[in-house]
Amino acid sequence: MVEATTTRASDSNQHLNHPVCFVGAGPGASDLLTLRAADRLRQADVLLWTDSLVCPQITALAPDACERIRTSTLTLEEVIPLLIDRQRRGAKVVRLHDGDTALYSAINEQICALNDADIPVEVVPGVSAYQAAAAGLSSELTIPGVVQTIVLGRAGGRTGVPRSEEL
């Protein structure tokens, strides 16, 4: 009897089994995706990505039957309900971001909204452009006795830079 109740409870909460997965696409080349990123793309039922920033070779890893939602013309306020809706329908949802999810990706706002909706998340990092640039130059970014500090920043633009962080 307990087993049946447990089964029904897990059936009614089936959507909790699939977190919304935020995946970093890396610097652009599909062969620079992490193995986990490629795996999540291959398992996706729904893929949301900014089509102006992610190359087609990467999105092509998603199954043919995957629902593909281009988000370059959508606001974050329009994307978040799509994430929630598709995940609650039981889909494996992948939100693909260019670069690395830890840098300039706006995943914080999305994760907060998903947390508020009691939806689990998974974050799969991507290779950052600065890492790919160093590899392309056959170089490393830290050298003992020479440099041990890396500062990442960006110029102000649409997204303002706090005065305390101006270089």
Where are these regions (language model features)?
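Class I S-adenosyl-L-methionine
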Residues: 1-127, 131-132
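A generic local secondary-structure boundary/capping motif
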Residues: 10-12, 37-38, 138-142, 164-167
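Acidic/glycine-enriched edge-of-secondary-structure segments
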Residues: 65-75, 143-154
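A polyampholytic, Gly/Pro-enriched intrinsically disordered region
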Residues: 90-97, 140-152
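Short, well-ordered secondary-structure micro-motifs
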Residues: 106, 134-136, 162-165
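Acidic/polar active-site rim loop that often engages polyanionic ligands
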Residues: 113-115, 145, 167
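Structured adenosyl-cofactor binding patch, chiefly the S-adenosyl-L-methionine
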Residues: 129-141
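Active-site glycine-rich loop that binds ribose-phosphate moieties when present
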Residues: 153-167
